[in-house]
């Protein structure tokens, strides 16, 4: 209800100014997001940005790519999470692999779930991104380590209102939720 109201207010020009809408566009473009993130990291590390922006001090300038180890599950990497916290994805992938699953990071194939656009009342853009994500990922389980992305993707059935979207959402799991259901796959550790 709140996001539908926001979308109506955006359409009326009463919420989310054009500059904010424009600022969200690079999230759907991995190359633009990487370039912008590196520029932000450099500006932040050199003290060019005010502290009130609240940017993390450890924004990465360079990151190692995520490499697929199989195709048992998708690991959704998203936009901001991948650009600013790829180390969390790397740790997540190691844990999933320890449970015996091959992992295929989504990376550029599905770069943005549309959660931020939806929250900003940009429903049309959120629906486009949701459709792109759904078309990009096969029929394997999709594991997510970002609560915002996971909640948005589990809501695609409601956002798009199709059986296809509802079936897709049923394949989305928080990584902890998925691993809890497969705890028997982990190797036994002796004290």
Where are these regions (language model features)?
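Iron-sulfur cluster-binding electron-transfer modules in prokaryotic oxidoreductases
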Residues: 2-191
